[in-house]
Structure formats: structure tokens, C-alpha cells
Design a protein with these regions (language model features):
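Conserved "HGTGT" condensation-loop signature of ketosynthase/thiolase-family condensing enzymes
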Residues: 1-94
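Active-site-proximal alpha-helical scaffold in enzymes
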Residues: 97-111
């Protein structure tokens, strides 16, 4: 991993995405828009993080070594689910904790 100031060769962009949800979200009006469901959020959050990243990589055609950094967070203290779910990926991980603002925080920091 590079140390110091990082200068990007290309502008940041969102090239792919993946989404996973719990049972209640899947049973809602947008249920068909999601990739994955599990019985409870707590049982599945780490797996959901892993699946979402794999889904985004698969859709984009990228491999993990093409990724400069992962910005992710969750609603469990100290980004436990994100940390465990993404631990086996060989890319720098930035754990975000902003509760409901985590998605906006990730988009802002990632861009």
C-alpha cells in the first residue's frame, strides 16, 4: 500500500454497486430490487457486506486488486460487521460510523 499523499490517476467514479437487505426490507415494496435476504440483520450484516462488495465487483468486471480503497460502515458499534465482512479482501478499508448518514459519508469521502 502506498504511504503519504495519494494522487489519483483518474477522477473518482461509481462504476458498480451491490445491495443486500434483511427480511423486512425484502418483504417491502422494493423487495425485488435487492440481491439477498437473511432472517435477521444481526445474523447477516457481515455476510451482507461481503456479498455487496462481491456483487459490485462482479457487475463491474473489476477484481479486488483494481480497488484503491473500500469505504464501508454499519449500525453496530465500531464497524464490527463491516470489519469482519470485508477483512479477507486485500484493499485498504476505511470504517465509517455515521448511523443513518453512513451512505452519504461514504459517497462524499469516496469521491
Amino acid at each position: 500500500m502506498q504511504k503519504g499523499i495519494i494522487k489519483l490517476n483518474t477522477l473518482p467514479s461509481i462504476l458498480s454497486n451491490g445491495s443486500v437487505v434483511g427480511k423486512k426490507e425484502h418483504d417491502g415494496p422494493l423487495g425485488d430490487c435487492f440481491t439477498f435476504e437473511m432472517p435477521t440483520w444481526e445474523q447477516s450484516e457481515s455476510e451482507m457486506q461481503r456479498l455487496a462488495l462481491n456483487e459490485a465487483l462482479d457487475k463491474s468486471g473489476f477484481k479486488i486488486h483494481d480497488i484503491d480503497a473500500i469505504f464501508a460502515g454499519d449500525l453496530i458499534n465500531q464497524c464490527t460487521s463491516s470489519g469482519y465482512g470485508l477483512a479477507n479482501f486485500d484493499a485498504p478499508f476505511f470504517g465509517l460510523f455515521g448511523a443513518c448518514s453512513t451512505i452519504a459519508e461514504g459517497l462524499l469521502l469516496g469521491s
